UniProtKB/Swiss-Prot annotation:
Transmembrane segments: none
Motif ('KMSKS' region): 283-287
UniProt name for this protein: Cysteine--tRNA ligase
Keyword Membrane part of the UniProt annotation: no
Cofactor note: Binds 1 zinc ion per subunit.
Quaternary structure annotation from Swiss-Prot or TrEMBL: Monomer.
Organism: Parabacteroides distasonis (strain ATCC 8503 / DSM 20701 / CIP 104284 / JCM 5825 / NCTC 11152)
InterPro entries named in the record: Cys-tRNA-ligase, Cys-tRNA-synt_Ia_DALR, Cys-tRNA/MSH_ligase, CysS_C, Rossmann-like_a/b/a_fold, tRNA-synt_1_cat_dom, tRNAsynth_Ia_anticodon-bd
Length: 491
């Protein structure tokens, strides 16, 4: 490829050049949501992070098969091996079938992802649709001697596995420390060690979600689904596995152990993890009850929110930080993101209307290369955005008549701005995204301003002022320029 991409591999703890196993094909698996409630800001971050990667790999010419799963069974409370299934609990509380809960929140998740301009994955498999594959995985691990059956459940034997391999290779945790510090919880005396994790759980009589297996009527452990579905759709070895940093342990650590125990080696070449969204310094999440849903951001209906924020403001807010750095929620940061995005969108609008000159007095030639350089440095989206802001200053100088752009440079700047702002960063002009209604609405405002312009030419100041004052009262900002009046909706 013309542009070598380097990404940070959590497994090796360093940036590495991305070399696909089967170029030009790329296999990418990302852990999706457990659908028992509305998506919140913490769900938006991995979705947007790996959407950025998906878009960029596609732009570089790779043929990406992007698999993002839906967890609809087996994810117990507190991410543990005991307690109630999160979806079954929600179903019981709302007196619904578990799959009604799944479908309702999955529909709402998709709506939120559409609003955030997150592209759909190539495949979106459900854990409940792959029980057979998970049972086969458990059988292989048992046959290879790294699991044991106990009272109808099957557990992964971490201590035995660690004698032949290395448990903790991803998270850097030491098994001796874990053996000494992990306490056995009530109801887990069927395990050899407290750190052993469930591959299959025997269902209690009241447990609704259950399937027959060689060991009992039950359900798979949470960690099995990604190993089984990753293998089914991407093969025994694939390029990228992504997810939030909170999944490194235990979920992804257990996935590596399952893969090695079942087939002799890890399935994944590059492990990638986005950092957390925090609120008052704590991870935002359902389990802590400190989350704000995306719907609440879009409507402003939450006591912590000073206003509503658009989906593109949320996306821009997340992309303004590098995906491996923490992002702390605040109204001030979101309002700054809103203003910054508005500046870029306005600049793009001006850019598309600029007229070329014979020569250029501003240098735009390095912009494309600088943006690619930032993206190739582990998807450094904040640096890309800073380069676009630099270009915005040049655009405004040309617009104000203080600088010029040749036809060639103008075309290059238009192409690069569009490529990075829309195609790669995945932003969209929310005003124009509403389609024909907005177009008709815009034409109506333009018509009023042309009538005002004619009134000014006729020295009919009363009509001119009336149109301006009425539009201002409705929330429009009117700016008179040498080329006529410009307008935008003010906040």
């Amino acid at each position: 490829m013309e542009h070598p991409l380097n990404i940070y591999n959590t497994l090796t703890r360093k940036k590495e050049q991305f070399i696909p196993l089967h170029e030009p094909h790329v296999g990418m698996y990302v852990c999706g949501p457990t659908v028992y409630g509305d998506a919140h800001l913490g769900h938006a971050r991995p979705a947007i992070t790996f959407d950025l990667l998906f878009r960029y790999l596609t732009h570089l010419g790779y043929k990406v098969r992007y698999v993002r799963n839906i967890t609809d069974v087996g994810h117990l409370e507190h991410d543990a091996d005991d307690g109630e299934d999160k979806i079954a609990k929600k179903a019981r509380l709302e007196q619904l079938e578990p799959m009604e809960v799944v479908q309702y929140y999955l529909n709402r998740y998709h709506q939120a992802m559409d609003a955030l301009n997150v592209l759909p994955p190539s495949i979106e498999p459900h854990a409940s649709g792959h029980i057979i594959e998970q049972i086969e995985l458990v059988k292989k691990i048992l046959d290879n001697g790294y699991a044991y059956e106990s009272q109808g459940s099957v557990y992964f034997d971490v201590e035995k596995y660690n004698k032949d391999h290395k448990y903790g290779i991803l998270s850097g945790r030491n098994i001796e420390d874990m053996l000494n510090t992990t306490r056995a919880l009530d109801g887990q005396d069927e395990k050899h060690n407290a750190i052993d994790f469930a591959l299959w759980k025997c269902a209690q009589p009241e447990h609704i979600m259950r399937w027959p297996s060689p060991w009992s009527d039950g359900f798979p452990g949470w960690h099995c689904e990604c190993t089984a579905m990753g293998k089914k759709y991407l093969g025994e070895h694939f390029d990228i596995h992504g997810g939030g940093m909170d999944l490194i342990f235990p979920h992804h650590e257990c996935e590596i152990a399952q893969a090695v125990a079942s087939q002799g080696d890890d399935m994944v070449h590059y492990w990638m993890h986005n950092n957390m969204i925090t609120i008052n310094g704590q991870k935002m999440g359902k389990s802590l009850g400190n989350f704000i849903t995306l719907e609440q951001f879009f409507t402003g209906d939450h006591p912590s929110l000073q206003q509503a924020y658009s989906a593109m403001t949320i996306r821009f807010f997340i992309l303004q930080a590098h995906y491996r750095s923490t992002v702390d929620f605040s109204n001030e940061a979101l309002q700054a993101a809103e203003k910054g995005l508005s500046r870029l969108m306005e600049a793009y609008g001006h850019l598309m209307k600029l007229q070329p000159s014979a020569t250029s007095t501003v240098d735009t030639k390095g912009l494309r290369e600088k943006c690619f350089e930032a993206m190739n440095d582990d998807l450094n989206s904040p640096i890309v955005i800073s380069h676009l802001f630099d270009a915005t200053r040049a655009i405004n100088s040309v617009k104000d008549g203080k600088a010029t752009l040749s036809e060639e440079d103008l075309k290059e700047l238009q192409e690069v701005f569009h490529l990075f702002l829309f195609d790669i960063l995945g932003m969209k002009d929310e005003a124009s995204a509403s389609g024909n209604h907005y177009e008709a609405f815009g034409k109506a405002v333009d018509l009023l301003l042309s009538i005002r312009q004619q009134a000014k030419a006729n020295k009919d100041w009363a009509t001119s002022d009336k149109i301006r004052n009425e539009l201002t009262a409705m929330g429009f900002e009117i700016k008179d320029t040498k080329d006529g009046a410009e307008w935008k909706l003010s906040k």
